[in-house]
């Protein structure tokens, strides 16, 4: 960590607190497509429409129509949505426990690239994750998504926290690099151990800062 004492923690959700697998969506859509499973996997991309959907610029119905055309799906919106929400594998409990522990020390926020349909699903499936945070910021509600610089600037504004005083945890290198360019402290998460390892020195740093503040107040009181 950098020398700046953290004032808030910011976590990604997918890949950090919730395990996701888009292969599950491909498997669910396969019976409705004229493409092979391999062709489906190749055809599904995080394309322009995907990003627009995550910014809330288009509704689910328009995005599902795009998927139906791109993946050659002869399926209803309900059937496409069933596959779309099948990506959530489970909660990464070890990280959630760490967030809950840190919340007693610092404000804990989440910022996730998502959409209204996925948000409804993970909010229902993982209430413990949702409840672990002071606030969850979502790309489709902000109209901004990672790794856009404006997205990080907006989070700093909404939390009233200087960028250099936020520690950000994400599983994608491009998001971590973008956060650093925006001035945040950032950690690449490949496993819950990366979160735990990064938090240990952070807690020591906070305790040291707290101790120095206490000692300063003590001596100022004596001198007064």
Where are these regions (language model features)?
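Structured helix-beta-strand junction loops
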Residues: 104-105, 132
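Residue-level signal for alpha-helix termini/capping positions
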Residues: 100-103, 160
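N-terminal helical cap/lid subdomain that shapes the substrate entry/recognition surface
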Residues: 2-97, 104, 115-119, 201
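Asp-based, Mg2+/Mn2+-dependent phosphohydrolase catalytic module
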Residues: 1-7, 11, 115-116, 120-224
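Generic structural signal for small/hydrophobic residues in well-ordered secondary structure
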Residues: 12-15, 56, 102, 110, ...
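Proline-centered loop/turn at the N-terminus of a beta-strand
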Residues: 107-109, 185
């Amino acid at each position: 960590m950098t020398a700046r004492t953290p004032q808030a923690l910011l976590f990604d959700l997918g890949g950090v607190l919730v395990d996701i697998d888009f292969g599950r969506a491909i498997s669910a859509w396969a019976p409705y497509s004229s493409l092979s499973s391999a062709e489906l996997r190749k055809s599904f991309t995080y394309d322009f429409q995907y990003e627009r959907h995550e910014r809330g610029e288009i509704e689910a119905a328009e995005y599902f129509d795009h998927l139906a055309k791109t993946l050659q799906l002869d399926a209803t919106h309900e059937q496409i949505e069933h596959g779309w929400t099948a990506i959530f594998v489970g909660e990464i409990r070890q990280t959630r426990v760490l967030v809950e522990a840190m919340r007693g020390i610092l404000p804990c926020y989440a910022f996730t690239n998502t959409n209204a349909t996925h948000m409804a699903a993970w909010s229902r499936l993982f209430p413990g994750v949702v409840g672990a945070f002071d606030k969850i910021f979502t790309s489709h509600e902000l109209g901004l998504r990672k790794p856009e610089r404006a997205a990080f600037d907006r989070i700093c504004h909404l939390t009233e926290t200087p960028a250099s005083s936020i520690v950000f945890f994400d599983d994608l290198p491009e998001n971590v690099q973008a956060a650093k360019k925006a001035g945040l402290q950032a950690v690449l998460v490949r496993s819950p151990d990366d979160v735990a390892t990064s938090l240990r020195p952070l807690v020591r740093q906070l305790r040291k800062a707290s101790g120095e503040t206490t000692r300063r107040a003590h001596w100022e009181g004596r001198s007064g």
